[in-house]
Amino acid sequence: MKTSVLLVILGIAAITVQCTASESVEQDSLRTFVDAVLGWNAEMASEARCGGWMAKCADSDDCCEAFHCTRFNVCGK
């Protein structure tokens, strides 16, 4: 009787650990996907602000590199 109760408890513990581990993997992959989408949206918004890849920014001392306005000397110009 004691052995069967112990086996049931160990079985429940094993199932709980397995379910918890699979939930964390699913959450990590979902978080990675959401971060990728949000990062892409931020890059597109930044590109619109500086006029596109390697475009000139409003300040003549800046240029657009990697979707961000930076100083010309940083851009190699």
UniProtKB/Swiss-Prot annotation:
Recorded GO MF terms: ion channel regulator activity; toxin activity
SS bonds (residue pairs): 50-64, 57-69, 63-75
Annotated signal peptide: 1-21
Keyword line: Disulfide bond, Ion channel impairing toxin, Knottin, Secreted, Signal, Toxin
Tissues where the protein occurs: Expressed by the venom gland.
Keyword Lyase: no
Protein family membership: Belongs to the neurotoxin 10 (Hwtx-1) family. 65 (Jztx-21) subfamily.
UniProt name for this protein: U14-theraphotoxin-Cg1b
